[in-house]
């Protein structure tokens, strides 16, 4: 039996390795994801499409988990995101700028699977870093 913090750790390992091939091992098939960049997905395939879009824009994206708090089926994580803006991200063309911004994620776990993810990132900071020079 895996504990909730370890499951969330596997989620961030998946992001940092850029390998989502084992997503079904940690996500429920009806995963609901709400990202601070305005994206809502339902299901593993939609989440993978979102991840592919983000990684096309920031191919070396890294999630540094700084604080992890577990309360029952909920896990809250304070994260610093970093990488290089190499591709188009929404309306922002590639700038080759290094980015670093913080956020918080709130994950719900049921039956040893992540069922819901809500991300609140500092969009203002991110957008200021990826505006054209």
Which functions belong to the PLM regions below?
Residues 1-133:
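C-terminal and inter-domain tail/linker signature
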């Amino acid at each position: 039996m895996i504990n909730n913090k370890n499951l969330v750790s596997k989620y961030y390992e998946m992001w940092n390795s850029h390998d989502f091939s084992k997503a079904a091992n940690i996500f429920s098939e009806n995963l609901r994801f709400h990202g601070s960049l305005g994206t809502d997905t339902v299901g593993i395939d939609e989440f993978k499409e979102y991840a592919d879009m983000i990684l096309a824009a920031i191919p070396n994206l890294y999630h540094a988990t700084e604080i992890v708090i577990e309360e029952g089926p909920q896990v809250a994580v304070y994260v610093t995101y970093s990488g290089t803006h190499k591709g188009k991200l929404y309306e922002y063309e590639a700038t080759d700028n290094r980015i670093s911004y913080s956020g918080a994620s709130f994950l719900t776990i049921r039956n040893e699977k992540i069922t819901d993810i809500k991300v609140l990132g500092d969009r203002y900071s991110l957008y200021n870093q990826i505006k054209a020079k």
